[in-house]
């Protein structure tokens, strides 16, 4: 299978995984990106089985609404049964790099509110060590240059993602050249830099389950310590 077919297979597997959890009052958290978009399309076939969704981006919200799935503001919701989203990289502990679509802050917030984080990805995203994919860092615009200098001190090579403004009105620095052997520690350290909103490491709150699309079928993986 090509990459698109792998993504479609894992999106359908995610729907199959979620279906037993759905009740009439269930609200799901739904992420952003190409694999999440395929999940939304597949989930729409079952929109009568649950109440609605909270989206981590304006783009996903528009897609959900286009399918007739009610979209709620997170402040209106007490509980999310699950959050389903893709990843740019994943390791054996199900620690992730996310944010290629610039929605990392909202993704991290919605993840924190969910009972379960279900990550969906194709096998090209499975890595032994995080960092080959540039690590996105969302920054307040006035702090961009300062944060970039601090990231250089940490061993990275930050690059301003020109033409990209997040849904929150901020900028993205993509940090190249990192081999991230201690993801949780680096996530915390970067978030301590004044001007950083958050970064794309999901290590302090990793995925609970990873549905990984491979040529041998979709594998269901859990964190390995």
Swiss-Prot record:
Annotated active site: 107
Enzyme class: isomerase
Keyword Isomerase: yes
EC number(s) recorded for this UniProt protein: 5.3.1.6
Gene Ontology MF terms: ribose-5-phosphate isomerase activity
UniProt pathway: Carbohydrate degradation; pentose phosphate pathway; D-ribose 5-phosphate from D-ribulose 5-phosphate (non-oxidative stage): step 1/1
Annotated binding of substrate, by residue: 32-35, 85-88, 98-101, 125
UniProt GO BP: D-ribose metabolic process; pentose-phosphate shunt, non-oxidative branch
Bridged cysteine pairs (disulfide): none
Reactions performed catalytically: aldehydo-D-ribose 5-phosphate = D-ribulose 5-phosphate
Single GO cellular component term: cytosol
Alphabetical UniProt keywords: Isomerase
Family, per entry: Belongs to the ribose 5-phosphate isomerase family.
Function: Catalyzes the reversible conversion of ribose-5-phosphate to ribulose 5-phosphate.
HAMAP family in the record: Rib_5P_isom_A
Quaternary structure and partners: Homodimer.
Protein's recorded name: Ribose-5-phosphate isomerase A
Gene that this sequence comes from: rpiA
């Amino acid at each position: 299978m090509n990459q698109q077919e792998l993504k479609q297979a894992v999106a359908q597997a995610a729907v199959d995984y979620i279906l037993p959890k759905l009740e009439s009052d269930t609200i799901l958290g739904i992420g952003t990106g190409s694999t999440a978009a395929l999940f939304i399309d597949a989930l729409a076939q079952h929109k009568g089985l649950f109440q609605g969704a909270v989206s981590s981006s304006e783009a996903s919200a528009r897609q959900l609404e286009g399918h007739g799935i009610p979209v709620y503001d997170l402040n209106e919701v007490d509980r999310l049964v699950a959050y389903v989203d893709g990843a740019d990289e994943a390791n054996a502990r199900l620690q992730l790099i996310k944010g290629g679509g610039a929605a990392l802050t909202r993704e991290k917030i919605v993840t924190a509110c969910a009972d379960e984080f279900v990550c969906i990805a194709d096998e090209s995203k499975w890595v032994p060590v995080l960092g080959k994919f540039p690590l996105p860092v969302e920054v307040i615009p006035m702090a961009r240059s300062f944060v970039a200098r601090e990231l250089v001190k940490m061993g990275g090579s930050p690059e301003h993602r020109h033409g990209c403004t997040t849904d929150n009105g901020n900028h993205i620095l993509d940090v190249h050249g990192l081999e991230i052997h201690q993801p949780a520690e680096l996530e915390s350290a970067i978030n301590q830099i004044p001007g950083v909103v958050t970064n794309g490491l999901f290590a302090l709150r990793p995925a609970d389950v990873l549905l990984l699309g491979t040529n041998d079928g979709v594998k269901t993986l859990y964190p390995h310590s």
